[in-house]
Amino acid sequence: MSTIGRVTQFTVRNSTLENLQHNLSKMSTLQAQMSSGSKINSASDDPAATADVLRLQGEQRVLAQYGRNADDGEAWLTTVDTALQTSLASVRKARQLTINGGDGALGATSRIALAQEIEGIRDALLAQANTTYLDRPVFAGTSAGPAFTAGTYAYNGAPAGTVERTVASGTTIRVDSPGADVYGEGDDSIFKVLDDIAATLRADGDPTDQLDAIDGHVNKMLAEVSSVGARQNQVESAQSVISANHLTSTTRLSAIMDVDLAQIILDLGSQEVAYKGALSAAAKVLQPTLLDFLR
């Protein structure tokens, strides 16, 4: 034998109020999504999606750091390359002047003028060798001071201390240049070679004996230019990968978080209609009780 449950006015009232609250809550959620443009406004909205969002945002922070590292590395290498190209042009000019100085018909005045020009090139080369980026010498490793000392041409850099930038997980790129390898140091430096050429010109000697030494330094500079170019290509490749990964991450975040505004507007309109309908029904269901009349 079945029994029929007794439905009281209290039960009807509570059920109706719960339905109203549910509709109101859904409408509030839709309004929050529309105003923020995001499907997730608190972790409780979608715990699983929230975890994905936090992970993707963490990836984006890492990618942003890699991007800054790559941009900084690119600036370092561009500074190094510019200094090397300028130095190469100067050394090649010095080579031509050395050949000119080998002309036995040159008078003393011309030879002195050539010597002075050679010394000017030496000073310009020394300035290039002490080039800095953001007050950091680019040819001195991790040392803070000038790479070379004028006069003695001693190398002050830290050969074992290289400047590197991390552009991906497990990928670092050297962004400085070993000054001692490029310009030499002390008596073996290009600066000393130019000093000797200038002295020979003033002494009415033949400076072309130094051409082989000049060529040796040119070859060292060319080798470093090639190395820097290869590293610049690495940085550019890393920047492309970082940009692509950032775009992928942003797209995935958008798919998780971004709302379809047109759909939200439709849903909100439908929810408002449902809420008004529920209010109308509640007004009919929640009739005054005898106690209400007695009051």
Question: What residue ranges belong to the model's regions?
Answer:
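Amphipathic alpha-helical polymerization modules
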Residues: M1-A144, A199-R295
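Cysteine-poor, low-complexity segments in flexible/peripheral regions
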Residues: P146-A203
